[in-house]
């Protein structure tokens, strides 16, 4: 049975993890270009969510949001690849730890489930969109 949290807590957890990653990269000192790449990834995700098509069926909604989510992670890993101080490894570690939080309705649960059983999470889709938007707003205020 997973931990049940509302959208505010989910966005707070994501914001803390992103802040932790930024601090780790900033401490490395040799990865200055990574901030531009990571920022571009966040902006791309934000643009995708802001231009989210309305009126799609549930299956298409999930597929669309999960595509945005996976694109964000791929973009982030690409942006961190050039950093020699282990930022990519840190990001992968944070991603794995986030999956282990087992927060019901999280994008990791919605998009990463290998069993394809995303049906019960469909009502949580608007909350996920709002919480992700809140996390992006929190990030941009840093």
Swiss-Prot record:
Residues 117-142 form a propeptide. Residues 1-27 form the signal peptide. The keyword Ion transport does not apply. Its main location: membrane. It comes from the Eukaryota. It is a lipid-anchor; GPI-anchor. Keywords: Cell membrane, Glycoprotein, GPI-anchor, Lipoprotein, Membrane, Signal, Synapse. Belongs to the neuritin family. This is Neuritin. The lineage of its organism: Eukaryota, Metazoa, Chordata, Craniata, Vertebrata. A lipid is attached at residue 116 (GPI-anchor amidated glycine). One of its GO terms (biological process) is regulation of synapse maturation. It comes from Bos taurus (Bovine). InterPro entries: Neuritin_fam (IPR026144). Component of the outer core of AMPAR complex. AMPAR complex consists of an inner core made of 4 pore-forming GluA/GRIA proteins (GRIA1, GRIA2, GRIA3 and GRIA4) and 4 major auxiliary subunits arranged in a twofold symmetry. One of the two pairs of distinct binding sites is occupied either by CNIH2, CNIH3 or CACNG2, CACNG3. The other harbors CACNG2, CACNG3, CACNG4, CACNG8 or GSG1L. This inner core of AMPAR complex is complemented by outer core constituents binding directly to the GluA/GRIA proteins at sites distinct from the interaction sites of the inner core constituents.
């Amino acid at each position: 049975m997973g931990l049940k949290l509302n959208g505010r807590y989910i966005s707070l957890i994501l914001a803390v993890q992103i802040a932790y990653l930024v601090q780790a990269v900033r401490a490395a000192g040799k990865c200055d270009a990574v901030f531009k790449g990571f920022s571009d990834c966040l902006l791309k995700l934000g643009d995708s969510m802001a231009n989210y098509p309305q009126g799609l069926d549930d299956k298409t909604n999930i597929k669309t949001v999960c595509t945005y989510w996976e694109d964000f992670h791929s973009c982030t890993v690409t942006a961190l690849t050039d950093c020699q101080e282990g930022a990519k490894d840190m990001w992968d570690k944070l991603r794995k730890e986030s999956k282990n939080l087992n927060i019901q309705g999280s994008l990791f649960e919605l998009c990463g489930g290998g069993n394809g059983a995303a049906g019960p999470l469909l009502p949580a889709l608007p909350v996920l969109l709002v919480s992700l938007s809140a996390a992006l707003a929190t990030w941009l205020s840093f």
